[in-house]
């Protein structure tokens, strides 16, 4: 298991478009990808779960990856969040 805490820089937070971009990008990885926020963990491969988390701009989230390609999954997930999630 690997993890990293990152700050959400997207001005609108994790709304439909960024949640979709994130989910589509991490789904091909075999590893589980979870987002830790406000004491809860959310499935990073589920658009609905990401939207339900109500993650706002400036929030610190923990990206947690566990599986055979966890390092690559974490690198991709961190890159997406740090780049603004396509917005």
Give, region by region, the residue ranges found by the protein language model:
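A composition-driven signal for long, intrinsically disordered, charge-rich low-complexity tracts
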Residues: 1, 16, 30, 84-87
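Intrinsic-disorder/low-complexity, polar/charged segments enriched in Ser/Thr/Lys/Arg/Asp/Glu/Gln
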Residues: 1-5, 60
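C-terminal structural segments of small proteins and small subunits
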Residues: 52-87
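Compact, glycine-rich, soluble single-domain proteins
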Residues: 7-57
């Amino acid at each position: 298991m690997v993890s990293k805490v990152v700050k959400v820089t997207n001005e609108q937070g994790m709304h439909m478009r960024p949640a979709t971009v994130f989910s589509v990008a991490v789904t091909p990885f075999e590893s589980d990808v979870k987002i830790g926020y406000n004491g809860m963990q959310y499935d990073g491969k589920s658009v609905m779960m990401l939207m339900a988390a109500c993650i706002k701009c400036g929030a610190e989230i923990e990206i947690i990856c566990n599986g055979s390609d966890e390092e690559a999954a974490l690198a991709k997930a961190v890159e997406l969040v740090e780049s603004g999630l396509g917005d």
